[in-house]
Amino acid sequence: MRIEAISRGAKKIFLIEKNIKVFRSLKSNLELIGSTKVELVNEDSIKYLKKLEHDAFDYIFLDPPFNQEILPLVLNLLSERKLIHSNSQIYIESEFQITEEFLGNNCDYECTIDKEKKSGNVYFCLITLGLI
């Protein structure tokens, strides 16, 4: 889905992957398609977001490892570091259902859950951010 965004007009994509095996697989696939619009980073996402200097993103895909409580940290970092803006959209996969209460506790923006589903043990949703 993230790489597919290139074919749908995304100007640039950042992929942050800590697992070296997954990183190498992604790198190999990106080399096959020859995309120069993807920045692939092999690092812990929390550490990377803490130092990232970038304008706010329009679209963000979050698929953190389950049972590690990373999602609240990432959402807070995105808000604090101004890496999101009103009208940003965030796609989230998690082991628990994302609620507006959860989002309100972990994001400085008004959040609207546009779509949500469950497949097996995975919940996923698309949210749109509103004004702070």
Q: Language-model segments: what does each one mean?
A:
Residues 1-132:
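Class I S-adenosyl-L-methionine-dependent methyltransferase catalytic core
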